[in-house]
Amino acid sequence: MEKGARHRHNTDKNHAGGSESEDFPEASSGGGGVALKKEIGLVSACGIIVGNIIGSGIFVSPKGVLENAGSVGLAVIVWIVTGLITAVGALCYAELGVTIPKSGGDYSYVKDIFGGLAGFLRLWIAVLVIYPTNQAVIALTFSNYVLQPLFPTCFPPDSGLRLLAAICLLLLTWVNCSSVRWATRVQDIFTAGKLLALALIIIMGVVQICKGEYFWLEPKNAFDNFQEPDIGLIALAFLQGSFAYGGWNFLNYVTEELVDPYKNLPRAIFISIPLVTFVYVFANVAYITAMSPQELLASNAVAVTFGEKLLGVMAWIMPISVALSTFGGVNGSLFTSSRLFFAGAREGHLPSVLAMIHVKRCTPIPALLFTCLSTLLMLVTSDMYTLINYVGFINYLFYGVTVAGQIVLRWKKPDIPRPIKINLLFPIIYLLFWAFLLIFSLWSEPVVCGIGLAIMLTGVPVYFLGVYWQHKPKCFNDFIELLTLVSQKMCVVVYPEVDGGSGTEGTREDMEEQQQPICQPSPGKDKDSLEQSQP
């Protein structure tokens, strides 16, 4: 990792707003350098948020939300409240995104506010749990919706589900490695299937209501509990719902590429989050018009069961549409995770080979292969709902830490420019909700939450050995350099270059900056004084 930082800074002298080589455009500039361009306008920004939120969650999580909520009415309330809380969290991230205008999202914010260790733990848990788990769940959902029509009287075989999910991951990894343009076109095509599936579900729900089929939506029936209310289970219902809203913060990963981020970042949030909340709530209402709670809980593919009850001979449309949606979701997640891992490697927090791109295709092949391998390993986990709980708990943990960092930054640095400045009541509301989820989730599922925390804490020794400890044995450095060289030759990749950076004079200074928080105890202590204190 140390060498990765050295190679990175040889070619990349960062300005205060972040690196100019953090992404991988489809072609290099004439001088051999790679630079980010501000090409994401308002429409594209909304597409990033909506496209990343609407994945497999709305087709998988309705079962988990209803099961833990205990009644139809409370389940609908969970979907509405989760959407509102998501909007509050997105507003907090909007302020952070323009105050710390770096790509990398909450990883960059946590690193700059709390220091290198905290940022590394965020990246570490994303590498080990969040992205592999998310991609595994979406891939398993894809395979379930493809195979379910072939097994109308029983569940598809587990081995078949996992094999098809693995094939899906390998195929899309190849597409993303081959061309950024190909990956973008795949995303556009399969987003159409995603929107078609949800529009069809909502329209059929409206038709059902017009026909008087709304028994479970009547107040006396909607709040008829089929199990004893439990505050811990309600917290788990919110975690299941939060999985469906996952991806609302992905626009912050590409802040440096936004056209006029001070305007378009909050505008995209104001448009996208209410739109997704509307779609999610009415999709769940549509499910209830066609299925009883017992039927919904018994279904392993909610949207397929919905289509079978309402579409008759055209029921095949639903599994195909949902499969298209989840296939595109895997593609988008692979693309996003490669950007995050690339950014982490650029900061010296991941092996330097992950910061390399193909010499002609300009795709981050090592980062894509790494995330594909980690997702394939995650497929051995037997219960996808346990995977969702892992993702939800750890995500809320770091969402809360990031929003807490917003309050810390207000206190420590009250005078720094803030083009967007929200009322402090918003982060406080979000933190209270976050605390409620974590406390009661830990109470209800101590083993699941404990495993998530244990995985996160494994990053502490890795950080001190891999990042903080700079004077490693020469034999270790030579071995890592050999592995990096072999990987370069196998993948035909190089470090991206930009004009204006040469030599190694900034290496120690920038590595020291990684380990220091933005909020220093002594305001006058800057990078120069830190560098002078080095032996």
Curated annotation (Swiss-Prot):
Pfam families linked: AA_permease_2 (PF13520)
Transmembrane residue ranges: 45-65, 74-95, 117-149, 158-178, 182-210, 231-252, 266-287, 313-338, 365-382, 387-408, 424-446, 447-466
Phylogenetic classification of the source organism: Eukaryota, Metazoa, Chordata, Craniata, Vertebrata
Positions bearing the site annotation: Important for substrate specificity: N134, G246
Residues engaged in binding L-leucine: I53, G246
Phosphoserine carried by residues: S19, S28, S29, S529
Protein name according to UniProt: Large neutral amino acids transporter small subunit 2
Activity across pH: Optimum pH is 6.5.
Compositional bias annotation for Basic and acidic residues: 524-535
Domain of life: Eukaryota
Cytoplasmic side: 1-44, 96-116, 179-181, 253-265, 339-364, 409-423, 467-535
Topology versus the membrane: Multi-pass membrane protein
The protein's role, per its UniProt record: Associates with SLC3A2 to form a functional heterodimeric complex that translocates small and large neutral amino acids with broad specificity and a stoichiometry of 1:1. Functions as amino acid antiporter mediating the influx of extracellular essential amino acids mainly in exchange with the efflux of highly concentrated intracellular amino acids. Has relatively symmetrical selectivities but strongly asymmetrical substrate affinities at both the intracellular and extracellular sides of the transporter.
Tissue: Mainly expressed in kidney and small intestine.
GO cellular component: apical plasma membrane; basolateral plasma membrane; membrane; microvillus membrane
Keyword Disulfide bond among UniProt keywords: yes
